Amino acid sequence: MTGRREDKRTLLVSFSGIDGAGKSTQIEALSSRLAGDGLRVRLIRFWDDVARLKGIRETSGHRIFKGDQGIGSPSAPINRRDKNVQSGPMTCIRFFLYFVDAVSVRRVVRKALRSDADVVIFDRYTWDELANLNMRNPIVRAYIRMLASFVPRPHVSYLLDADPLQARSRKPEYPLDFLYANREAYLTLAGQIPGFTVIAPIPIHEAAQQVLERAREELSERKVSRPESLIGASKDDSNRYTEANIRV
């Protein structure tokens, strides 16, 4: 706890949503406004700083399922095959990978809360992995409840809702039917896990204002507490993979 004021409480925030929902834009806007307020903001990228066993994910998406690599754009659409591949064996693999990531989340959150940051922003969180699962399966629902109770819960979990058709036009990587199903999964999670703030599909500047107001509301109340019972983990993996390769 060296270097931290005893009365200091770090605000933990996460951003989630389907691909193309505008998370990067809103994260940048919130970070800039909070920094302008004189707050120390730290950004943690889930795929870079939290996710583990990234080589397995890259292999399954590209070599096994023959999906494209990289990040899609309107001028260069791609066809990814990773988190949109639904099967019994893949669900079992995801159960394992997501639990490993959950352990990593606990370690990363504990480290972040010991830093001098006033606000810690997660670019994606455990919720983005759980939204890849088939929630119609009772075993899957039990697993989701278990993992949701295992990871530290952000004080504010933003869900940027988006029209799948518009999202895919901005970031063409996955089939439209998957994006519709993925959106419904996110909304279902938001209704079951406390702490979500759903931002409806509205113009960027209006969404940014809603995001900022919610963060400032939480900061002004300061009714926050550090997640307890965090466990340790091994040192960070020095190998860095890009988000484009590991979204299993």
Where are these regions (language model features)?
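Extreme N-terminal, non-catalytic leader segments
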Residues: 1-12
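NTP-dependent small-molecule kinase module
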Residues: 3, 169-248
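Hydrophobic anchor at the beta1->P-loop junction of P-loop NTPases
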Residues: 15
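P-loop (Walker A) phosphate-binding loop of NTP-binding proteins
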Residues: 18
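Conserved lysine of the Walker
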Residues: 23
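Hydrophobic positions on the alpha1 helix immediately C-terminal to the Walker A/P-loop
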Residues: 26
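ATP-dependent small-molecule kinase phosphotransfer cores
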Residues: 48-135, 142
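A glycine- and Lys/Arg-enriched "phosphate-lid" helix/loop adjacent to the NTP-binding pocket
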Residues: 119, 124-188
